[in-house]
């Protein structure tokens, strides 16, 4: 399979979606990743069904006070125009002007001051292959 530019491009010969392995598949509650309120941030796009599923589970488990949420703009944009054509979820600083107000999207990520989810992944794990994450 050729290197992918987004999770949507991970399709096998039969047209089925095949997710690549991720560096971010650890379990919260382990010694390395203790379950501590405020330690983690859930990033979501309300346009992404996978992300909306995580919001539903967070609510069903009553974790709203434990895991804060940051919402990104509901459309993809080029994440590093000077470097490559990768498109992914972005914050208001890089989004269409009307996207941020409708969904209370912050200008930048509150943790890393990043302007895209790709930049958040790269800040958390500098060696991450951005093509293999839904960014």
Features from the language model and the residues they span:
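A short linear-motif detector with a strong N-terminal bias
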Residues: 20-22, 48-49, 115
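A short, hydrophobic beta-strand/beta-hairpin element that forms part of a small beta-sheet core
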Residues: 132-135
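A generic structural signal for solvent-exposed, polar alpha-helical segments
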Residues: 23, 30, 56, 95-97, ...
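Thioredoxin-like thiol-disulfide oxidoreductase module
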Residues: 78-128
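Local sequence-structure signature of Cys/Sec-based thiol-disulfide redox active-site neighborhoods
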Residues: 28-80, 86-90
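N-terminal regions that are enriched for targeting/export leaders
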Residues: 1-40
